[in-house]
Amino acid sequence: PMSLTPLDISAQVVGLDPNRPDEEYTLTGQATIAKTRAEVLKVGLEPSEPDACPQVLEAIHASDNLVLGPGSWFTSVMPHLLVPQIVDAILESKARKILTLNVSGADETDGFSPPRHLEVIAEHEPRMRFDVVLVARGFAGPDPPLESFARTLGAEIFINELALRDVSSPHD
């Protein structure tokens, strides 16, 4: 676990009610957020500044490579960037920082382009920088906006085959 404190996750979303597509709603709970078809704008934790698990901080400091993703973008990947001690440890780390985008745009990020994944990171934690962004071929071909946005995060883009087989899950 990233924290020894029990945490609740919430998300600000739009598009939940088709009759009010621009109205914002707050959803709570990992399962609820993961299943929503609304557009997730922002996620948060309660408590908002939990202490990080000491073993997590030790692992970050001892790492040669830090890999964020793939996974459910808003409920598995982003929460790590909402714990201030974890963010500080990542920023202070000399490890190579690697961001792996999902192999498809399914689930919470349905309709998200690869650049949008990077924008979400920057919106939630503007100080975050990466050395490398890995993108699955087929999820993104040559994409000048993706390459440009990756450079703003300090990253070099690598587009390659990342899935071992045809999968429908964005995690594999």
Briefly describe each language-model feature range.
Residues K94-D107:
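Short, flexible loop segments at boundaries between secondary-structure elements
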Residues D17, K42, E46-P50, V132, ...:
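Metallocofactor- and cofactor-centric catalytic cores in central/energy metabolism, strongly enriched
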Residues S63:
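An anion/phosphate-binding loop that grips the pyrophosphate of nucleotide cofactors and donors
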Residues G111-D172:
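C-terminal functional extensions of proteins
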Residues W73-L82, P144:
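Glycine/threonine-rich flexible loop motifs
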Residues P1-R37:
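Electropositive, gly/pro-rich neighborhoods at or near active sites that engage anionic ligands
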